[in-house]
Amino acid sequence: MAYILEYINHEFNGAIRDGNFYDLGSGIGKPVIAMSLLHHFKKLIGIEYLDNLFNYSLGIKQNYENYIEERFRKNKDLFNFQKPNSTDFLHGNFLEQNWEDTSIIFANSTCFSENMMNNIAKKANKECKSGTIIITFTKRLTTLNAEWELRDGFRRIMTWGVATIYIHRRK
């Protein structure tokens, strides 16, 4: 996630400053927690449909918030950045949530169906504002309209193997 964020900041001249991060199909919430440490987003939201993963993410969130609160309280002078904003996890279908305020949408879409990818593109075409960035893994969003550009597709080693990362940006 750090490499992807650095890439986006470099390519788009810090265009995500003070934005909102959404993780579609957030699982147990690792990308949301990672992004909260890497960048000071206004809002970080993970959206997960599966009960077990959603419930597990709530426990991880609580542990993370307790840990970070203690570290900032005890070592405030060691940190040269603001305390991360709180993260939030929503239980439900990410296609039923509002995406109008997103700056970055992340989808580890390796296992998403073609139909799911088309539904994500359809919703992004309808709701995302100019400058919104969508990051997908393994599969790109082929049905985005002409207002979107595919900025890059590059391969990175993940803990589970190699993935192609696609960066889409609304003009």
Please name every model-derived segment:
Residues 18-27:
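Conserved class I S-adenosyl-L-methionine
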Residues 102-115:
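A short SAM/SAH-binding and catalytic strip from SAM-dependent methyltransferases
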Residues 43-48:
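Conserved SAM-binding motif I beta-strand of class I
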Residues 112-171:
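C-terminal substrate-binding/active-site "lid" region of AdoMet-derived donor-dependent transferases
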